[in-house]
Amino acid sequence: MDLSKYKAPLSPLSSSVTSSLSKEVVLMEFNDPSHSDEIVKLDILDGVYKDKKNSYFVKCTTLMQEVRPLMIDWWFAWHLPDSERYQLWHPLDHISSKLTQDRSNLHNDKERYIGINSYVEEYIGKKYSKLCISFLDPKEFGLGALDINASTAICARVTDMDTGVKIANLLHYVENNDIGSKMQSYFWLGNNLEHDNKLINSFLTYFSKIHFLKGLFINNKLAKDLLRHCYEEMNHLASFLPELYKDIGTSSNLDKSL
């Protein structure tokens, strides 16, 4: 499948975005992902927030012209199995993407990505990361039933593959608006470090309490780089997704999208 018509360089970020990126990190206590039903209703300004335990909360808003929530669900179902598709999203930072499960036979977009593990390699700032992104049912983030025609929520747990440590949670909450949709992206970094190995997990629990050590790995720079990365990839996605979805995302063209 030829994707060349959808490939384009990143556009410069708007003045409002660069203003948000220039803000200092704000000291603030925040709720964990299980309270997402409350969090998405709050008027939280874009930026980076840090609590007293050196955990981070990142908020990023993207206005997506002519993009509807169902297109976002389709995008996550469609792009995950293929590195070239993944690179469309951020042509500079995204390197590779693969799945170990094949759900291409399913026609419901949510069923094609919820419950799977996506293995990606990408840059966040100058940091090269190998990550496993485990997509979860929004109910696990405390979100109730969503009307696919009005809203959607992409929820995931992120594991660093070099260490096996679960380091972050993410939520992309998308709602219809007058121009298309509004995406509110939230990231929680370091608030609940976990490992599948019980011994290592016990160490992580102790390690997390030593805040200055935790700050050596999860810090202001990483959080601010993540904010910039999210602004770039989501604004870029909005620039080509309407045309991509029109060409291959509709039900009449489903076979071509696999």
Task: Specify the residue positions occupied by each region the protein language model found.
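Terminal "cap-and-tail" regions of soluble proteins that handle hydrophobic small molecules
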Residues: M1-K52, Y173-L258
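Hydrophobic ligand-binding cavity/cleft-lining segments
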Residues: K5-A8, P12-K110
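A generic short-segment signal for beta-strand/edge and adjacent turn/coil regions
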Residues: E24-D32, Y56-V58, D137-G144, A150-A156, ...
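Short, surface-exposed coil-to-beta transition loops
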Residues: F57-K59, V165-L171
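A short, structured loop/turn motif at beta-sheet edges
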Residues: E66, L143-N149, Y173-K182
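Glycine-rich portal/gate segments that line the openings of hydrophobic small-molecule binding cavities
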Residues: H94-V165
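Broad, structure-driven detector of short, well-ordered beta-strand segments within folded domains
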Residues: I133-L136, N169-N176
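Beta-strand-rich recognition/accessory modules
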Residues: A150-D162, L170, K182-G190
